[in-house]
Amino acid sequence: MFVKKGDKVRVIAGKDKGVEALVVTALPKVNKVVVEGVNIVKKHQKPNNENPQGAIVEKEAPIHVSNVQVLDKNGVAGRVGYKFVDGKKVRYNKKSGEVLD
């Protein structure tokens, strides 16, 4: 998967289109990512020791990886490619040519 935890990404589709934020979690088995402050859902929690009455908690839900683009250091969003630099495989922004790793 081309997105890693800690990458700065721009959401390119969905209700949060245009938002730029950091990836909190990458879920490669299901091709999804959790992005900070994006796709907030309300979860109804059952009563437990912490909340004896239960609660409605807002949390970030995963979005599909195809709905985000990785930003480079200059803030340019583009597709991610792979190339070898000094014998190491690195990710780079195909639009700007900037190395991401």
Curated annotation (Swiss-Prot):
The keyword RNA-binding applies. GO terms for molecular function: rRNA binding; structural constituent of ribosome. InterPro entries: KOW (IPR005824), Rib_uL2_dom2 (IPR014722), Ribosomal_uL24 (IPR003256), Ribosomal_uL24_CS (IPR005825), Ribosomal_uL24_KOW (IPR041988), Translation_prot_SH3-like_sf (IPR008991). The keyword RNA-binding applies. One of its GO terms (cellular component) is ribonucleoprotein complex. It comes from the Bacteria. Keywords: Ribonucleoprotein, Ribosomal protein, RNA-binding, rRNA-binding. GO terms for biological process: translation. One of two assembly initiator proteins, it binds directly to the 5'-end of the 23S rRNA, where it nucleates assembly of the 50S subunit. NCBIfam families: rplX_bact. Part of the 50S ribosomal subunit. Belongs to the universal ribosomal protein uL24 family. PANTHER family: MITOCHONDRIAL RIBOSOMAL PROTEIN L24. This is Large ribosomal subunit protein uL24. The gene is rplX.
